[in-house]
Amino acid sequence: VNILEAARQNSINRISHASSMAAHSFLPGSDSLKTLYGAYKMCDEQISEVYWQDHKVPSMCLRPAIVNGVGRDQGMTSKQTVAMLAAAFGEPYDIPYTGNVSHLSAAEVASAFIHSVSYDGDGAFVFDIFGESININETIKMINKIKPNSKITSSGSEMPFPSKLSDT
């Protein structure tokens, strides 16, 4: 809200902000989201829509899936990157989830944000950025290919988010 209000007060003609694939994590047969984080991100998206409706503050919201790479060391979805770092240092690491997950590089997501802020649009737009859906066991195989005999494992439940959606 603070960024949108600052944009309104200072006649800024476009902003770009991040949501998350967690905004898609609805409980089966329900309008309720599975996670507080997903509800928070969905709320941000709706606030942007209202700022466009009431104040004509345009915005571009991107919903990246799991981002891997430099700078990803916080939060549940950073654990693949943490595993890569552990392998590089020869340390064991257990990725605390299983199943299929989307893979995006930090560089491609950064590029999407840079391009999104350069777009002049009339509205509050939301776009998904999902990348390739890969089973976490395949990720571990890729890590082992680069760093043989790494001690990377995975356990736990699947992530409560979709692993693949269209990038639209």
Predicted features and spans:
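Conserved sequence/active-site signature of Rossmann-fold short-chain dehydrogenase/reductase
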Residues: 23-24, 67-69, 109, 134
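Catalytic tyrosine of NAD(P)H-dependent dehydrogenase/reductases that use a Tyr as the general acid/base
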Residues: 37, 41, 101
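C-terminal substrate-binding subdomain of Rossmann-fold SDR/epimerase-dehydratase oxidoreductases
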Residues: 96-99, 103-168
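Conserved Rossmann-fold NAD(P)-dependent oxidoreductase catalytic core, especially the SDR/UDP-sugar
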Residues: 2-38
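Active-site beta-alpha turn of Rossmann-fold NAD(P)-dependent dehydrogenases/reductases
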Residues: 16-20, 63-65, 130
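Conserved catalytic Lys-bearing alpha helix of Rossmann-like short-chain dehydrogenase/reductases
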Residues: 3, 40-48
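NAD(P)-dependent short-chain dehydrogenase/reductase
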Residues: 49-101, 108
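Hydrophobic pocket-lining residues that define ligand/cofactor binding sites across diverse proteins
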Residues: 7-10, 52, 116-117
